[in-house]
Amino acid sequence: MHPIAAGAFSEGPNERSVLYHFLVAESETPDERAARRHHAGRSAGESYAATLEQMNPGVAITRVAPADAEAAVLPPHAIARYDAVFVTGSPLHVYDDTPEVRRQLAFMRAVYASRTPAFGSCAGLQLAVVAAGGRVRKMPERIEAGIARRITATDAGRDHPLLAGRAAAWDAPAIHGDEVEDLPAGAILLAGNAVTCIQAAEIRHDGGIFWGVQYHPELSPGEIAVALRRQADDLVAAGLAHDAAGVERRAALLDALHDAPDDRALLWELGVDRQFADEAHRRIEIANFIATLVAPHRRAA
């Protein structure tokens, strides 16, 4: 296992001396954040922030938790102070009519209204879809955990800047039991695979723009290994492994790849290539989002 040490993150208002000001929205509830810290060393938002800091040294990051009952409600003009918003994954089911989901959907609608460019992974994509009028469902058959295989760009996605640098087909870290059923009106489907037909999309709504993916470009193989172990019972119940030992074998391979991304034997055994193993390639959608929607506006400010 690879527990990840907690890091320090910048909090606070905009200052022109920093590279960017990012707002990271945790999709987890307090209990879910505590559970992930126990197993992985960080909440989803802390992990996302660490990735963004590594990719953009000098960035300032504020984390918020819109699901929390005591969380301050951020109006669009407050969100507009940031250069970009990142919405994390979580175990939430966006189709459940709970106070936590309603609060997060209200936050996402405020993000759109703020016209601040936004990016989301997994549940982050699902929140953005439902907030703009689309639909999310429980997967009819859960068969995507660990690695999303052979993701392929649509005709619209081949020339879309979100997927610049991607091969004709690629694998990515993934773990989810829900999926987008219908995109909102006007959204652009950018990629899919045989398991989940909506793997990447662009959504424009209420003056705002969102790019998102169903997979997890922000996560390392070691973090995916932790997630597999946490959900071992569910994965066995779904028929993805015969028993917990089978889940452990797959998690151990991902741990090993985390430590040795150039190990050809591990790449062969997992059935992945360097686009999955190489950190920069794995994060390419995040880098493309920042380069295309964030950096030009920051320079013009």
Region locations from a protein language model:
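Short, glycine/charged-enriched secondary-structure capping and boundary segments
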Residues: 37-39, 99-102, 132-136, 187-188, ...
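Short catalytic/ligand-binding loop motif for oxyanion handling, primarily in non-cytosolic enzymes
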Residues: 31-32, 93-95, 127-130, 199, ...
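Pocket-forming structural segment of enzyme catalytic cores
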Residues: 134-227
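N-terminal beta1-alpha1 cap of cysteine-dependent amidohydrolase-like domains
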Residues: 1-100, 105, 110, 114, ...
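Structural motif
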Residues: 15, 77, 120, 181-182, ...
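A hydrophobic, small-residue-rich beta->alpha segment in the mid-to-C-terminal subdomain
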Residues: 219-253
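Cysteine-nucleophile active-site neighborhood
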Residues: 82, 90-155
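Hydrophobic/aromatic beta-strand patches that form the interior of the parallel beta-sheet core
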Residues: 23-25, 62-64, 86, 119, ...
